Amino acid sequence: MNTHISVSTIPHLTGWHAINWKACHARVRKLQLRIAKATRQQQWRQVRELQRILTRSFSGKAVAVRRVTENTGKRTPGIDGKIWHTPKEKWGGVCSLNLRGYRPQPLRRIHIPKSNGKTRPLGIPTMRDRAMQALWLLALEPVSETTADHNSYGFRPMRSTHDAIESIFLRMSQKVSPKWILEGDIKGCFDNISHDWLLSHIPMDRRLLKKWLKAGYMERGVFNHTNSGTPQGGIISPVLANMALDGLEKELMQTFRKSGYHSAKHQVNYVRYADDFICSGSSRELLENEVRPLIAAFMRERGLELSEEKTAITHIDKGFDFLGQNVRKYNGKMLIKPSKKNLKNFLCKVREIIKRNPTLPAWKLIGQLNPVIRGWATYHRHVV
């Protein structure tokens, strides 16, 4: 198949504002559709060639720079302290996205608070590294979306937590639905994914991927090496994590829906959002003795393991928490409502705002509380 397509490097324009964004997005979209088609046909040489064309195109570079300079992290610099704010800086960013001589800089490590009081480490790349990752994300996402598990909902276009909850409701609300639930918890998923597995299975430029994985990070002026995992904070990291976890649903379906098994007795359902997942089965024994070992073996190949303390098997009548919701059957009828932990965190946030502003006029305090209350109510508006 002929992969030739007319792609310019850096056209002679007057600057950032002269870019025809409609044409750029159309060219990128056309190449992404061709990458997805080649992936479905398993023509991997064709995929690599089309990825090469996309990542060298002016359109791809411009769209990538626009993405990283217009998202919520656009004012957060990496270790070089630079951000691309002016049109001239953005144009220079487009011109800088070349593989030749490219060497990513270490990430700037920061810690953000979690709802449980602990902190989550984030690695902040430089603007150039962010743009290069965004460029390759354009080339890798068509592959990941084509090969993704059907019931994977995290970090994917046009999918959300509400879709994951709806999927659970559709599969578990019937009388004949499986009644036992395996709540899966992967121990340090982003921090422990095997670099060897990623380099062997992710269809992109391996030398570039290795540079990103081994870039390391700076914390309190000290350089730290990275020997495993994908840094939380990198634009491409969620897609790499998703691709590492994809394939489990297919393996479960092939194992428990093959001939010789009665569908009702061995029915298994699986729903995943990022590194959180649940798996339903007809009995505790099935989940404990067959499903859990299969999942553990799948994770082990990728350098991951299930948390013994947090991975649990529960009955649907007792309910389980997933993505801030509590899913439970009451006398055979499924109800989904905010989980106790989610409600507690919400009330703590409201109390903290009130305590932090004891002298604030009521109308100003209401102005600070409203976004928090509205956000929580909006997230839970589809339940029960």
Segments from the language model and where they lie:
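Active-site-adjacent bridging/hinge elements
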Residues: R103-S115, K210-H225, G367-N370
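Charged boundary/loop elements
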Residues: T14-G73, L138-G154
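Phosphate/adenylate-binding "loop-and-lid" substructures adjacent to NTP/NAD/dNTP-binding pockets
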Residues: V47-T119
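Short, solvent-exposed helix-loop connector elements
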Residues: P121, H225-T230, R351-L365, G375-V384
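Extended, highly charged clamp/arch subdomains and adjacent linkers
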Residues: M1-A18, A38, P113
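A conserved non-catalytic segment of reverse transcriptases
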Residues: R302-Q368, V372-R374
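Core structural elements
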Residues: R56-V63, W363-Y379
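Conserved polymerase palm-domain catalytic core
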Residues: S96, R100, T147-N151, R156-R159, ...
